[in-house]
């Protein structure tokens, strides 16, 4: 880049206005990346945003991922719209897992019942994205079943505690073997 181009880039004003969409963890908004630089480019006070967001989410369990819209106004003030937790958070919580499957379709990371899916759908149907489009509950349920499938979570009609315990034991053995294989692969790569 020429000296003139660099000088011109240095003189540009920061972007003002617009909407920033992000998933921010409840009570854990911090001025660092990835949110800090995006807000800084728009001229928004990062510390003020973090303070306001953390204050508004203090009643929610810390660490829950919340879809957030930040409406930046031309005078560099902002308005925060906080949505409900993500579908993947609800599904992973219902299945009792931390991560989805590595290879969806080939492995099952967890199990949820149709009752779980229905309860999640009732909560998410109130979400702005579904409510504005007047989406029927059956469509929300299908959407959540699709999300579960993409996470490697199997939706079953009924699930007894014995079946769940057997699945969790089997899954723990599978994850331990997977971790062992990963460590062996890392050691092999380090030797090369």
Curated annotation (Swiss-Prot):
Entry's Gene Ontology BP terms: mitochondrial translation; translation
SUPFAM superfamilies listed in its UniProt record: Ribosomal L11/L12e N-terminal domain (SSF54747), Ribosomal protein L11, C-terminal domain (SSF46906)
Taxonomic superkingdom: Eukaryota
Species: Homo sapiens (Human)
GO MF terms held by the record: large ribosomal subunit rRNA binding; RNA binding; structural constituent of ribosome
Cellular location(s): Mitochondrion
Protein name as annotated: Large ribosomal subunit protein uL11m
Disulfide cysteine pairs (residue numbers): none
């Amino acid at each position: 880049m020429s000296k003139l181009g660099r000088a011109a880039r240095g003189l540009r004003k920061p972007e003002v206005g617009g909407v920033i969409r992000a998933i921010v963890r409840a009570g854990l908004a911090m001025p660092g990346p990835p949110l800090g630089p995006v807000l800084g480019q728009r001229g928004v006070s990062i510390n003020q945003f973090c303070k306001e967001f953390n204050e508004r989410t203090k009643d929610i369990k810390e660490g829950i991922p919340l879809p957030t819209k930040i409406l930046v106004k031309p005078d560099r003030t902002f308005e925060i719209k906080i949505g409900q937790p993500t579908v993947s958070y609800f599904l992973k919580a219902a299945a009792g897992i931390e991560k989805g499957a590595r290879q969806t379709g080939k492995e099952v990371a967890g199990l949820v019942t149709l009752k779980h899916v229905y309860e999640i759908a009732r909560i998410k149907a109130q979400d702005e994205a579904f409510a504005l489009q007047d989406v029927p509950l059956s469509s929300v349920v299908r959407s959540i079943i699709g999300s579960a499938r993409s996470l490697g979570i199997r939706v079953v009609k009924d699930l007894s505690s014995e079946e769940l315990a057997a699945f969790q034991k089997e899954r723990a053995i599978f994850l331990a073997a997977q971790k062992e294989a990963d460590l062996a692969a890392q050691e092999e790569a380090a030797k090369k």
